[in-house]
Swiss-Prot record:
Positions with a binding annotation for Zn(2+) 3: 34, 37, 44, 58
Family according to the record: Belongs to the RING-box family.
Subunit relationships: The mammalian APC/C is composed at least of 14 distinct subunits ANAPC1, ANAPC2, CDC27/APC3, ANAPC4, ANAPC5, CDC16/APC6, ANAPC7, CDC23/APC8, ANAPC10, ANAPC11, CDC26/APC12, ANAPC13, ANAPC15 and ANAPC16 that assemble into a complex of at least 19 chains with a combined molecular mass of around 1.2 MDa; APC/C interacts with FZR1 and FBXO5. Interacts with the cullin domain of ANAPC2. Interacts with UBE2D2.
Post-translational modification: Auto-ubiquitinated.
Protein name, as recorded: Anaphase-promoting complex subunit 11
Any one biological process term the GO annotation gives: mitotic cell cycle
Residues binding Zn(2+) 1, per UniProt: 23, 26, 56, 59
One Gene Ontology molecular-function label: cullin family protein binding
Keyword vocabulary terms for this entry: Cell cycle, Cell division, Cytoplasm, Metal-binding, Mitosis, Nucleus, Ubl conjugation, Ubl conjugation pathway, Zinc, Zinc-finger
Consequence of substituting residue 26 to S: Greatly reduces autoubiquitination activity; in isoform 1
Main location: cytoplasm
Amino acid sequence: MKVKIKCWNGVATWLWVANDENCGICRMAFNGCCPDCKVPGDDCPLVWGQCSHCFHMHCILKWLHAQQVQQHCPMCRQEWKFKE
């Protein structure tokens, strides 16, 4: 017996792999997007600090811009440095 496939519709899904489920700044889910973005994905990436905390890129950039003197992680207050 042979089976012939006449039509095939592929479906894919993606998820960010992060320590938490929600951004510590905006409290939105990582599999969604930050309040500044309309659609989740590459335009709203996640970024990690050397302290291992993770945030939406736009959220942490706003947070760091608001810090006048020293830029600290909003979760642990260590000096913020992006993980490479």
